[in-house]
Amino acid sequence: MLESLYKNVKMGSDSIIKLMDKVSGQDFKAALTKQIDGYEKIAERLRKHLCSMGYQAKEENIMVKLWSSVGMAMETLTDSTDSHLAQLVAEGSSMGITDSIKLLRDYENTSVSEEALAFAREIIKFEEHNLEVAKSFI
């Protein structure tokens, strides 16, 4: 579960970093910078927790990252306005919420640690906040 959460937050951070060059509005750029910082802080805590358990934190494989980059390039090819970029960020946050809820539901009645479940709940709240912020720029 923790490995999946780590991959999800790293993918969120990486995706927004790739969009930053296209953002024109300073308020939107500041909001995205704050979001990246939040992702990276959660990822670092997850990485440390995984290492303390003897696991290595791994990001998505290169093919998943490549397809994500291609998809993002296609989405912004004809429309790279801040409003459209905010829509993409909102869609990404919605996916993050859905993925984290699914992980939470799959593991909440198992022997997985309460700390792992707490990470999932934290990410859901973080992504819900990110979604609301993104909607304000659409």
Which ranges hold each PLM region?
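Generic detector of short, locally flexible boundary/turn motifs and exposed helical patches
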Residues: 12, 23-25, 51-52, 59, ...
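Alpha-helical bundle segments that constitute or directly flank the non-heme di-iron/ferroxidase center
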Residues: 1-23, 84-111, 126
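Conserved alpha-helical segments that form or flank metal/cofactor-binding pockets of metalloenzymes
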Residues: 30-63, 134-138
